[in-house]
Amino acid sequence: MTDTGCPAQSVDLRIYWGVAGHAAPNSHHRRGITLNRITIELETGRVSGRVASGFEPVAAAFADNFARHREVGAACSLYHRGRPVVDIWGGFADAEATRPWEQDTIALVFSAAKGPTATCIHQLVEAGRLDVDLPVAHYWPEFGCNGKEEITTRMVLSHQAGLAAVDGVLSLDQVLAWDPVVSAIAAQAPNWVPGSKHGYHARSFGWILGELIRRISGDSAGQYLNKHICAPLGLRYWVGLPPQMVSECATLLPPEGGSNAVAELLGADSLTARVMSGPNGLFGYNDMWNRADVLEAEMPSSNGVGDARSLARFYAAVIDEVDGVRLLGPAQLARACEEQVRGADAVIFHETCFGLGYALQPALAPGAGPRCFGHPGAGGALAFADPDAGIGFAYVMNAMQFNPEGDPRSRTLVKAVYDCLATA
């Protein structure tokens, strides 16, 4: 287990529940479902929120993470059949335990951003504005050189494009400015023969897809996302955090050794190290992700910022209508979730499975349904939909942990969710 530098907490068993079915001050009605207020006292701090009857074990599991898995601050949300049934948060938004994690605290979710970004692409496909089997160069002519002429959007979405590592010498300011990094990608040669294997495109995924969104729609990826997904659903989620929201973001607590562990193990010139720290070794899992300029830039695969409530609502609206909004039609969603690749990943080595932009089971969310799709984020974040169970789930946190067997915090929450669904 990774040490975050914060002591484990014990859970005070004084759990205060609202009374189901009564519109008292401690309950909240939502389209026929009563969400009961809950408070769970921790050794320091508390868990707060609202939970529908029958889903109380999710809140208990969430609180247990503070005692058993060194949670610092986090939030978890669950939609079931288009309606919220769990909305909880707790702990602290900083390492010093001076900022309680509040209802409106937002957090960096790293690669959990890939799900919303992929959904932007699928909206363009569904509208007839993008064909995933045409070369990327059809929309972005400068891209079609140095062995990339036949790379398709399908290859990019399924991590087969061979552009996992970005070549070129770039400063951080250039990367954050967008144009220099996408120009570098357009000029480079692939890392492997496109389509011959798959390997995780940790950051280039978002730059390539974001440039496609810009060239087709005229909006940056963050602008398109806000206009067509976040605003219609009232989501507090951004790629390119507005400056006035930076103060509401939880402080990321990096894991020990997170910055250079891959390079030290495999060598700085290894493909894996180049992907995970690139471009040009600029990125590590360290305090740089708390910088305002990094949060305010657009990195559509890496720096989504939002709350669990919004990500759960987002996935609920991908699979079904939520308050009159559905993000993708059934036919497009089915195509998006068709398995494209499965097997040993050329970048991160263990088995991965991808549809068109979405991570798929079994690696996505162990213990969840077989047709789940979504995306995890580095250090623990997880957001996904299960169309069979009719759920949108999200968990966000600030204390990064890397565990080769999977994050025990999200695993505990997912198990509690499905146990509740089984008895509903």
Language-model-derived ranges and their functions:
Residues 48-110, 131:
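Short, conserved catalytic-motif segment at the N-terminal edge
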